[in-house]
Amino acid sequence: MVHQVLYRALVSTKWLAESIRSGRLGPSLRVLDASWYSPGTRQARKEYQERHVPGASFFDIEECRDTTSPYEMMLPSEAHFGDYVGNLGISNDTHVVVYDGDDLGSFYAPRVWWMFRVFGHRTVSVLNGGFRNWLKEGHPVTSEPSRPEPAVFKATLNLSLLKTYEQVLENLQSKRFQLVDSRAQGRYLGTQPEPDIVGLDSGHIRGSVNMPFMDFLTKDGFEKSPEELRAIFQDKKVDLSQPLIATCRKGVTACHVALAAYLCGKPDVAVYDGSWSEWFRRAPPETRVSQGKSGKA
């Protein structure tokens, strides 16, 4: 069997700092701040304007999505994504490094990492430890806005990394894919509410396994080692040699499952983009499981 050589999914703060110092930023290397925070908490764009990694552009996940969809954070079209990242100076030959400023060390960056991959881009990495550790280690920051020269990016959707509602519904019968839910246990069980949203009860898709995405991160905000990640999958009886779909509430933290599996040598985890936000509104009641007061989500 021929093993696929995987592009490095993580780069260190030290590597990025040295790359910036040595003048490597440009058409061949771009940095993106993909921070996003719940309304009424922190303001991602304002924080970016105040301080960011030198040369980084702001990737606004609210803009680079399907704004016509009734569901949260759905993927944009190929043309939309290509135009958006092209305007950030990214071409099909660019190595893209993504970070965010979340206190956990990483939250939205893996979503943007996955978005690039699902649109056919191989050379994309997450900054391990995020902006939290960039600051902690004393690396330089700036308020200088980034003005990269626009580039041409041709997006080609890789459908093998994306699952739809219909495919997940069919999978309840065929069981061809394992299904992992990356939300916190209380939300998965239905005993804690979904935050920042009205009309969406908590619970999970029947047959899914709960693997909270925070378990993939160390207390210092770094990705755990491949050995530790494999042990987490094994503990949950998730077989990395078999097909796997990741889900969450809106297709964001599910990408942490895809990243963790990738770091274990499995690059083909698909994300259910609509996730619980869509499933709750569309799926038959018997496919929604909850330990909440109603017994069903």
UniProtKB/Swiss-Prot annotation:
InterPro entries: Rhodanese-like_dom (IPR001763), Rhodanese-like_dom_sf (IPR036873), Thiosulphate_STrfase_CS (IPR001307), TST/MPST-like (IPR045078). Residues 144-159 are annotated as: Hinge. Substrate binds at residues 187, 250. GO terms for molecular function: 5S rRNA binding; thiosulfate-cyanide sulfurtransferase activity. Its EC number is 2.8.1.1. Residues 25-143, 173-288 form the Rhodanese domain. GO terms for biological process: epithelial cell differentiation; rRNA import into mitochondrion; rRNA transport. PROSITE patterns: RHODANESE_1, RHODANESE_2, RHODANESE_3. The modification N6-acetyllysine is found at residues 14, 136, 163, 175, 219, 224, 236-237. Contains two rhodanese domains with different primary structures but with near identical secondary structure conformations suggesting a common evolutionary origin. Only the C-terminal rhodanese domain contains the catalytic cysteine residue. This is Thiosulfate sulfurtransferase. It comes from Mus musculus.
